[in-house]
Regions:
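Catalytic histidine neighborhood in serine/cysteine hydrolases
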Residues: 245-263
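Short beta-strand/loop motif that positions the catalytic acidic residue
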Residues: 220, 226-228, 232
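Catalytic histidine-centered segment of alpha/beta-hydrolase-like enzymes
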Residues: 260-269, 273
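Conserved alpha/beta-hydrolase "acid-adjacent" motif
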Residues: 233-239
Length: 282
């Protein structure tokens, strides 16, 4: 379904599971888990079907960021972290969601970090999964070289330094398999993802180049879980450790996954979902 969030913008939203469930002589309200996808330029498909296993704990709201996937096209002037972060609040207002648990994967984690800075009292909990706080080019290049040798480093250097359709296509064909340490459980999953390269190239060539999200993390006013695969080349371990250290000590939690790449639930779903279930239920 498409939800109006103001000023003519509509987001594609999919909801899994009831929010109210029978519990003896009463109806119990489950928390709402909002899942924000990576990219930018991709859609929410990567969360499905894996995240369905959390539907017993929380009502799950998947959505495509403004301009992405099945959401309405929007002008490039709206393709900014501030706008995408504010859209979380707009979407919650439209759906009547209060105190959500907000999960941001990769680029979705950039959005979640900006959301923490701009709306520190809005969430009940935040999960920052496989994300970074800056470009961190040299770390990326070193990580890709460790995983795939000099050729992988060169492909990463070309795309992240000079983003274009040509450099992205070469990069994606040459290093996408290095993002994770295990083969995809579903080889057809990538084909289900809707991709908008215009948004990807706009962001990587613009706001991403000078990205700096650490300072805003001191605004956190709720528990924040940082999840990181220790062998993630695109959002390296060091970035996650710096994100964790920038959060207020009373709110921060860290989950490291050895031998795991980008998106811990892909490479070690048993461990990753155990951590998520514990954090959601706390």
């Amino acid at each position: 379904m498409k939800i109006h969030i103001g000023n003519g913008a509509r987001l594609f939203v999919d909801v899994e599971g009831p929010g109210l469930v029978p519990d003896g002589a009463r109806m119990r309200e489950k928390p709402t888990l909002i899942c924000m996808h990576g990219g930018p330029g991709f859609d929410h498909a990567a969360f499905k079907p894996a995240f369905s296993q959390l539907a017993d704990l929380a009502q799950i709201v998947y959505y495509d960021h403004r301009g992405h996937g099945r959401s309405d096209p929007r002008p490039s002037s709206e393709w900014t972290l501030d706008t995408w972060a504010d859209d979380i609040v707009r979407l919650c207002d439209a759906l009547g969601i209060e105190r959500p648990i907000v999960l941001g994967q990769s680029f979705g984690g950039f959005v979640a970090q900006r959301y923490i800075a701009r709306h520190p009292g809005h969430a009940s909990k935040v999960i920052l999964s496989s994300t970074s706080h800056h470009m961190g080019l040299e770390r990326k290049l070193a990580a890709f070289e460790r995983r795939g040798g000099p050729e992988a480093r060169a492909l990463a250097q070309a795309f992240w330094s000079q983003p274009s359709r040509e450099t992205f296509e070469a990069y994606w064909a040459g290093v996408r398999h290095l993002y994770n340490t295990r083969p995809a459980a579903d080889p057809e999953a990538s084909g289900r993802t809707l991709v908008n390269l215009d948004i990807l190239l706009h962001f990587v060539g613009g706001e991403k180049q000078d990205l700096g999200l650490l300072q805003g993390l001191e605004q956190a006013r709720c528990p924040v879980l940082v999840m990181v695969g220790e062998d993630d080349p695109v959002c390296p371990l060091e970035d996650a450790l710096e994100i964790h250290d920038a959060l207020p000590p009373q709110w921060r939690q860290l989950a490291r996954f050895p031998g795991v790449g980008h998106g811990a639930w892909r490479d070690d779903p048993t461990a990753a979902f155990a951590v998520l279930r514990k954090f959601i239920a706390e």
